[in-house]
Amino acid sequence: LLDHQDYVKSQWGYYYMVGSNGALMTGVVSWQGSLYYFDPSSYLLKTSGSVVSGNSAYSVASDGKLTLLTGNQAFLMIIKQAAIDGWKKYGVLPSVTAAQAILESGWGKSTLATEAYNLFGIKGSYNGQSVTMLTAEYGSSGYYYIYDQFRKYPSYYQSIEDHGYFLASNSRYSNLLWNRNYSTVTYLLHEDGYATDPNYASSLNSVITANGLTSWDYEAFNS
């Protein structure tokens, strides 16, 4: 066994990363000042395309080196699988989940998203973890601000998974589960009291169409 982490080439020409305990490493691995990604199933070095790991997205060069991606497309890459899994597990439409995350977190740039990985503004605590922040509410006299407690998550994936659970476990949202029409789902979200903003449904619809998010729905339906 090796007594240190090393990058090795097999007799068949495949590259692997071996840990100091002799076990093959997977996921994002740092080696000689660069990041690489080793597939969790095959253990092989990825040498093309892009990859998502945790709360980060990367482009992959032909030599396997990773470059961190930023911006809106990177955010979509990071949340896509969790949104699709939310349909499979809870019946929450992926396009709507993504639009809510985009709208409510400002593409993951809100203070709540960056400090607590909370993409949906869900209040309360998650496994005992929470943060207190200033939030805008809408009432009969318009918008006003209050301090409230919000759930704190270890990652975006848990935030999206909890969003699906939140909707599925609250009976008032049962009418939107497993519905395949995004405009119906966004309408019901507002009618059921998810948000107080009178333009909430139309704002979600605009985000969905602008970013082609219905393609995620079809991918979920066919997977």
Where do the model's predicted regions map?
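Extracellular adhesion/carbohydrate-binding repeat motifs centered on closely spaced tryptophans
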Residues: 1-74
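Catalytic cores of secreted/periplasmic lytic hydrolases that degrade extracellular macromolecules
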Residues: 68-223
